[in-house]
Amino acid sequence: MEEADRILIHSLRQAGTAVPPEVQTLRAFTTELVVEAVVRCLRVINPDVGSGLSHLLPPAMSARFRLAMSLAQACMDLGYPLELGYQNFLYPSEPDLRDLLLFLAERLPTDASEDADQPAGDSAIFLRAIGSQIRDQLALPWVPPLLRTPKVQRLQGSALQQAFHSSRLVLPELNCRGEPREFQASPLLLPAPSQVPQLLGRAASLLEHHAIQLCQHVNRDCPGDEDRVRWASRLPSQEDPRAPQQRLHKQLIEHLRQSWGPLGAPTQVRDLGEMLQAWGAKAMTGVPKGSRFTHSEKFTFHLEPQVQAAQVADIPAASQRPEQDTRAAQEEELESLREQLASVNHNIEEVEANMKSLGMNLVQVETECRQSELSVAEQEQALRLKSRTVELLPDGAANLTKLQLVVESSAQRLIHLASQWEKHRVPLLAEYRHLRKLQDCRELESSRRLVEIQELHQSVRAAAEEARRKEEVYKQLVSELETLPKDVSRLAYTQRILEIVGNIRKQKEEITKILSDTKELQKEINSLSGKLDRTFAVTDELVFKDAKKDDAVRKAYKYLAALHENCSQLIQTIEDTGTIMREVRDLEEQIETEMGKKTLSNLEKICEDYRALRQENAGLLGRVREV
C-alpha cells in the first residue's frame, strides 16, 4: 500500500496539491490536506465546478459543513459509486480516502505526448508548484490595503499603511555666528528620538522639521516669511488650514525652479557635497566648528571685543617684561627645582635603606622573643612540678600511699579503657574487613566494567569505520545518481507496475496452492474420520459379542467406549479451537481496519467541532439578542 500511496501522492502533486515532503502515506493526511487535494482534482477534472470551491478550509464550522457537502455532491455528480457525505472529508478514514482519491486520480485528464515530453524531476515539480501558486494568487480578487486581513496580507505580499502623524521637535538653532547654542539648552533639551516616543512618528516628525528648515533656507532674505514659516506649526493659526500647505508647495516649486534652471537649459551635473556646501555656505562661512566644551569656554571666559580692546589700551606698553628675561628666570627656577628634586630622591633612598635594615632587625628580635617565651614556659612548668614535690615532702609516707593508690587506680582505669577499646575495636575491625571486601568487589566490578568500556570503545570505533565506509559508498551512489538522467520516463513506472502485477500473480498462485492443500487435507480428514467410525463399529460389534461371557472383555468394552468418547471430545475440541483461532484472526483484521479508520481521533475531532459549533451558536444568539 505504501508504494500505491506514493504513486497516488505523486499524481496529486502533479494536479497542484501542496503535499508536504514528510507526508508519504494517506494515513498522514489531515483534513485540510484532504479538502485541498479533492478541490484541486475537481478543478482539473471539471473547472466549472472546481472554480467555485475553495481549497482552504474555513474556520467556521457551518462553512466547513457547507464546503464538505458541496465536495460530496460534486464527487457524486462525477459518478462516485460509494456512499459519500461530509464526514468523509471532515473526519476521513484511510480506506475511504484511498477509494475517493483513486476515483478522482483515474478521472484526471492525461495526454500521452505531453507526459512523454514533460520532465518529471524535482525541478519540474518545483516549477509547476510555483506556477500553481502564482495562478492561485492571480485568481484572488484585489482588496484595498486598508481592508486586507492578515491572511490576505500574507497572500498578496503587502504591508499595512500607516497614517502620517508628526510631532513638534525642539532642536538647537543657529545664532548670528552660525554656532549651535547647545550650552544654553543642553540640560533640558532631549535628543530627537526621545522627544517622539512612538517609533512610527519619528520619521514623520523629522521630515516635517527638515521641510521647515528648507523653507527657512529658501526665505532667508524675507524675515517676515521666515518667522511665519518657523512659527506656523507652533502657534494656532486663524487662516485657512490649507493656505500653509499651498504656500509651502509654491515655495518648494520656486526653489526647485531656481536651483535647476529653466526646462530648456542644459542641466549641470553637481556633486552632492558641492550642493550641501552651497546650501550651508551662507550660514557657515568663516566659522570653525567647535565642541561643546569650547563653546562653553567661550561663553564663560571670553570677553566682548570692545571690553578687551579697552583693557588692552589701559595697560601701558612699558610695563611688559622682555621675553628674554622671562625665559632666563624660568630656566633658573627650573634648575633650582631639579636640584631640590635630586636631593629629595637621595634622602628617600637613604630612608628606604634604613627601613630595610630596621625591618631585618625587627624580624630577628621577634624570633628571639618567641624562643625566650618558650623557654620561660618550660621552666615555669618544671618549677610548678618541683614546688608540688616540695609540698608533699613533709608527710612522705601518707603521700606515698596516696600516690600508690592513684597509680593503682590509673592502672585499673587503663585496664578498663583497654577492655572498652577491645569492645569497640572488634565491631570496627569486622566492619573494616567487610568494607575492605566490598572495596575489593567494587574494584573487580570496576575492572570488569573498564574492560567492557574498552570493548565498547573498540566496537564504537569499528562502527565509526563502518559508518565512514557506508558514507563513502553513499557519496559514490549519490554521484552516480547525479550522473543519471533526471527525467523519469514512463518506462520506470511501467516496470514498477509490471513488478507489482508479478508479485500479485505470485501471491495468487500461493493462495491457490494453499486452498488446494486445504481441500486435500479436508478430504483426508473426512476419509480418516469415516475409517475411524467404521473401525469402531466393527470393534464394538466384536467386543460386544464376547462381553456377555467374559468379565475382562466386558472391561475392555467399557474402556473402548470411554476411548471413543474421549477421542470424539478431543476432535470436537480441536475443531472448536480452529474455529476460535479463525474468529480471532477475523477480529484482529477488523481491529486493524478500525484502527486504520482513525475512529478515536475522528471522535476527538467531532467533539472539538461540536464545542466550536456550540460556541458559534452562542455567539450568534448573543448577537441576535443585541439586535
Swiss-Prot record:
Residues 1-321 are annotated as: Sufficient for interaction with COMMD1. Residues 1-447 are annotated as: Sufficicient and required for interaction with CCDC93. The modification Phosphoserine is found at S410. Keywords: Coiled coil, Cytoplasm, Cytoskeleton, Endosome, Phosphoprotein, Protein transport, Transport, Ubl conjugation pathway. Residues 321-384, 448-535 form a coiled coil. It is found in: Endosome; Cytoplasm, Cytoskeleton, Microtubule organizing center, Centrosome. GO terms for molecular function: cullin family protein binding. GO terms for cellular component: centrosome; endosome. Its main location: other. One of its GO terms (biological process) is positive regulation of canonical NF-kappaB signal transduction. Belongs to the CCDC22 family. Component of the commander complex that is essential for endosomal recycling of transmembrane cargos; the Commander complex is composed of composed of the CCC subcomplex and the retriever subcomplex. Component of the CCC complex, which is involved in the regulation of endosomal recycling of surface proteins, including integrins, signaling receptor and channels. Involved in regulation of NF-kappa-B signaling. Component of the commander complex consisting of the CCC subcomplex and the retriever subcomplex. Component of the CCC (COMMD/CCDC22/CCDC93) subcomplex consisting of COMMD1, COMMD2, COMMD3, COMMD4, COMMD5, COMMD6, COMMD7, COMMD8, COMMD9, COMMD10, CCDC22 and CCDC93. Forms a coiled-coil heterodimer with CCDC22; this heterodimer interacts with the guanine nucleotide exchange factor DENND10; the interaction is direct. Interacts with CUL1, CUL2, CUL3, SKP1, BTRC. Interacts with SNX17 and SNX31. Interacts with CPNE1 and CPNE4. This is Coiled-coil domain-containing protein 22. It comes from Rattus norvegicus. The gene is Ccdc22.
